[in-house]
């Protein structure tokens, strides 16, 4: 199986009433059976923050231009399998994750989710219920480092 490298920008989205946005990728996607945060590949010439903003808009339809955005110091790596959309080829993906903490000054119920791109499901989860879900290894580690689970 062929291996590809990808730098990934993602975000932990917080509402002002202590909910976090998590989702699951569509079938064949990265970590398809586990909960993840919105994010995706950083395009050439794009900053990590620009990529995170674009991916959030593409995956869940939320514009975070006016939100508080802070880089998370923890940089992680991970490897998983993925089916390439254009060719159907199954590949191994070596990823480096660069994440941001994004705080939106609205309650979760007032932040609509519009699923597009890679996300097949997404929901706002109260922080105290995050420990009930099964996450990708990188998201689990990230949530633990932030004291969320």
Describe the role of every protein-language-model region:
Residues 29-33:
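A conserved beta-turn-beta hairpin within the catalytic core of GNAT-like acetyltransferases
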Residues 1-20, 38, 98-101:
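Conserved N-terminal beta-strand and adjoining loop/helix that marks the start
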Residues 146-147:
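Short glycine-centered helix-capping/turn motifs at secondary-structure transition points
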